[in-house]
């Protein structure tokens, strides 16, 4: 007990109730902390360092216990910069892992790895929190049925369908429409599935995170007037953060998504941009903790770390988390341990093509490079499978003929090949689609196309029933009826010009 000098009444020191340690060593973002005998914190416990530095600036650093070294010493990794910390400073063991706010209060807000809002919009309701370290759902809780997650985007639903509760790799360079595709998926899941989305920015540029936030506000995905009506929560741990924050920010985003799945029983989209940076941060932390590196300098625990994240992303009987993960491939080497370990968990890949983007075909999803384990007759049905295969065959034949066309021209092709080229060009244009989130930029109203409508449209093109329509009628339309209506309008316009 100690006495408060202003009231002379006895008050209990809050520090006396806490498990206190002291900093023994600081090496970059890694701290060694000594605790009293018998008072050692558990692995993954959060430690708080609070105080003032030599110039009187307030310090508030949270660390996570990674190793128990013996002699009452633990090694922890800081979640923020360790500037100003000194040996001998007091460290408080919180007695639990990092916990972050979850639920509806998180929608429309930006958080850091600790679940603190960083968007200057005031505090967040923290009555409901959840620890970021949790076990994956037990096998008995899983929903093991194969079911398609309809996105309303023609090229995705037809050629590389997403699995409900699956994991999708999103491959694409800068400026090919990755962000717009992500925002459209967020918009469509909210409208068609009544679901919400969580975006985890892992180790990417701060500017990109800010741009995404601004574009989401412009497109209405984040509702500025009524934040509670927003469709997405954002969690950022960007490039300038210490490796501990970048390694854990994916778990923070996943924890928020799990609450929507397990408690609200919703379908959730979880975006991770970029999953490679999660591995990279783990590699940095592993080296700082003194572990022996494995192949290509990666951490020896690479598969375990990846599995602990990916196995929590799944469908249960309550709801589902469908994850779309941007994958950076270092030096375009698909055999690098980081992307190779990621591929083992993916159900589908969506590859964005710069060639298609240059032609103005949006979304610029490559129909030949994008794949899905769901595209099997027993899962999607014979009709869907046959249509998708014929679309791919026609597109592949057109690709093979392009060199001949460039050198000799269309006239040198056989009648059959000319017909194939004409249909392939219609298919290529029909794979484009106006997006709801791009309305403010293009002026064209967005279109959600159901799977049955998508299949019917491509079957009509492949059957030759629409051979007489001009190919520009198929560009940036929703279903096939819009294409035929557009063809009639084009015909009327051309007659009026004459």
UniProtKB/Swiss-Prot annotation:
Q: Which residues bind ATP?
A: 172-179
Which keywords fit this entry according to its UniProt record? ATP synthesis, ATP-binding, CF(1), Chloroplast, Hydrogen ion transport, Ion transport, Membrane, Nucleotide-binding, Plastid, Thylakoid, Translocase, Transport
**Biological process according to GO:** proton motive force-driven mitochondrial ATP synthesis
Q: Which GO terms describe its cellular component?
A: chloroplast thylakoid membrane; mitochondrion; proton-transporting ATP synthase complex
Keyword Glycoprotein annotated: no
Please verify whether the record's keywords include ATP-binding. yes
Q: According to the UniProt entry, what is the EC number of this protein?
A: 7.1.2.2
The membrane topology of this protein is: Peripheral membrane protein
List all disulphide bridges recorded for this chain.
Answer: none
| Reactions the enzyme catalyzes | ATP + H2O + 4 H(+)(in) = ADP + phosphate + 5 H(+)(out)
Tell me which Gene3D superfamilies the record gives: 2.40.10.170, Bovine Mitochondrial F1-atpase, Atp Synthase Beta Chain, Chain D, domain 3, P-loop containing nucleotide triphosphate hydrolases
HAMAP family per UniProt: ATP_synth_beta_bact
Q: Which family does it belong to?
A: Belongs to the ATPase alpha/beta chains family.
Function, please?
Answer: Produces ATP from ADP in the presence of a proton gradient across the membrane. The catalytic sites are hosted primarily by the beta subunits.
* Protein name as catalogued: ATP synthase subunit beta, chloroplastic
From the UniProt record, report the name of the gene that encodes this protein: atpB
């Amino acid at each position: 007990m100690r006495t408060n000098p202003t009231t002379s009444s006895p008050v209990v020191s809050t520090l006396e109730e806490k498990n206190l340690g002291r900093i023994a060593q600081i090496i970059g973002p890694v701290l060694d902390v000594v605790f009293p005998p018998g008072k050692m914190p558990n692995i993954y416990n959060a430690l708080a360092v609070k105080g003032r530095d030599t110039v009187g600036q307030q310090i508030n650093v949270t660390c996570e216990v990674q190793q128990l070294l013996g002699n009452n010493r633990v090694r922890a990794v800081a979640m923020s910069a360790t500037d100003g910390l000194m040996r001998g400073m007091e460290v408080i063991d919180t007695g639990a892992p990092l916990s972050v706010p979850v639920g509806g209060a998180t929608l429309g807000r930006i958080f850091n790895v600790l679940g603190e809002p960083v968007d200057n919009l005031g505090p967040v309701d923290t009555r409901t929190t959840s620890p970021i370290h949790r076990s994956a759902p037990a096998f008995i809780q899983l929903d093991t049925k194969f079911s398609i997650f309809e996105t309303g985007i023609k090229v995705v639903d037809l050629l590389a369908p997403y699995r409900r509760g699956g994991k999708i790799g999103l491959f694409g360079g800068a400026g090919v429409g990755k962000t717009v595709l992500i925002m459209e998926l967020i918009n469509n899941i909210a409208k068609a599935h009544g679901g919400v989305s969580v975006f985890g920015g892992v180790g990417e540029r701060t500017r990109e995170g800010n741009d995404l936030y601004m574009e989401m506000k412009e497109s209405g995905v984040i509702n500025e007037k009524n934040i509670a009506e927003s469709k997405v929560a954002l969690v950022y741990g960007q490039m300038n953060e210490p490796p501990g924050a970048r390694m854990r920010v994916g778990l923070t985003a996943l924890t928020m998504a799990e609450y929507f799945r397990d408690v609200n029983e919703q379908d959730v989209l979880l975006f991770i941009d970029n999953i490679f940076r999660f591995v990279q941060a783990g590699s940095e932390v592993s080296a700082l903790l003194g572990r022996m590196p494995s192949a290509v300098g990666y951490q020896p625990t690479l598969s375990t770390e990846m599995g602990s994240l990916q196995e929590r992303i799944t469908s249960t009987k309550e709801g589902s988390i469908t994850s779309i993960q941007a994958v950076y491939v270092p030096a375009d080497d698909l055999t690098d341990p980081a992307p190779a370990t990621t591929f083992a968990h993916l159900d589908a890949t969506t590859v964005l093509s710069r060639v298609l983007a240059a032609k103005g075909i949006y979304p610029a999803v490559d129909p030949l490079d994008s794949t899905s384990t769901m595209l099997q007759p027993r899962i999607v049905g014979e009709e869907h499978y046959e249509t998708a295969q014929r679309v791919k065959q026609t597109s592949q034949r057109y690709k093979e003929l392009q060199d001949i066309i460039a050198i000799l021209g269309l006239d040198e092709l056989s009648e059959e090949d000319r017909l194939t080229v004409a249909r392939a060009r219609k298919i290529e244009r029909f794979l484009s689609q106006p997006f709801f989130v791009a309305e403010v930029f293009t002026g064209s109203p967005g279109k959600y196309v159901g799977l049955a409508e998508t299949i019917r449209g491509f079957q009509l093109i492949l059957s030759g029933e629409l051979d007489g329509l001009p190919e520009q009628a198929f560009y940036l339309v929703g279903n096939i009826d819009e294409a035929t209506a557009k063809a009639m309008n084009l015909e009327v316009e051309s007659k009026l010009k004459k």
